[in-house]
Amino acid sequence: MGDKTKVQVSKLKPGRYIIIDGEPCRIVNITVSSPGKHGSAKARIEAVGIFDGKVRSIVKPTSAEVDVPIIDKRVGQVIAITPDTVQIMDMETYELYDVPIETGVEDEVKDQLKEGITVEYWETLGRIQIKKVRGE
């Protein structure tokens, strides 16, 4: 996977996604400082990691380009649950994925997981995270 694209900093908005330190993150806040007499405007971007929940921030000129992850939102079925992984099968391609429970499953979804249910998962930068339960 590893799909990403470039976007100009001035086009970013809260709620969108960005790659900071190689980690896909959701933008929480953007503050733009006005340019000085000979400088360019700078943007401070605060974001939370999708997989680890860590808060990260960067400062870039508004004219700079940054990497933005391409997030593939898909539907799968839980095939098996082990103490440390969940095995899901994609409903379109029938591929099997082993997702680690610690980093690959949202906290509010962990107690709802059982074999045979349908889940929505996100795939980005070669990593998978189960986001929500769709139903039986």
UniProtKB/Swiss-Prot annotation:
Q: List the disulfide bonds.
A: none
Sites of the modification Hypusine? K37
Q: What keywords appear on the UniProt entry?
A: Cytoplasm, Hypusine, Initiation factor, Protein biosynthesis
Top-level taxon of origin: Archaea
Q: Which InterPro entries match?
A: IF5A-like (IPR001884), IF5A-like_N (IPR048670), NA-bd_OB-fold (IPR012340), Rib_uL2_dom2 (IPR014722), Trans_elong_IF5A_hypusine_site (IPR019769), Transl_elong_IF5A_arc (IPR022847), Transl_elong_IF5A_C (IPR020189), Translation_prot_SH3-like_sf (IPR008991)
Question: What's a GO biological-process term for it?
Answer: positive regulation of translational elongation
Q: Where in the cell is it found?
A: Cytoplasm
Q: One GO CC annotation, please?
A: cytoplasm
* Pfam families assigned: eIF-5a, IF5A-like_N
Q: Which GO terms describe its molecular function?
A: ribosome binding; RNA binding; translation elongation factor activity; translation initiation factor activity
Family per UniProt?
Belongs to the eIF-5A family.
**Summary of the function given for this chain in its UniProt record:** Functions by promoting the formation of the first peptide bond.
| Name assigned to this protein | Translation initiation factor 5A
Species this chain originates from: Thermococcus gammatolerans (strain DSM 15229 / JCM 11827 / EJ3)
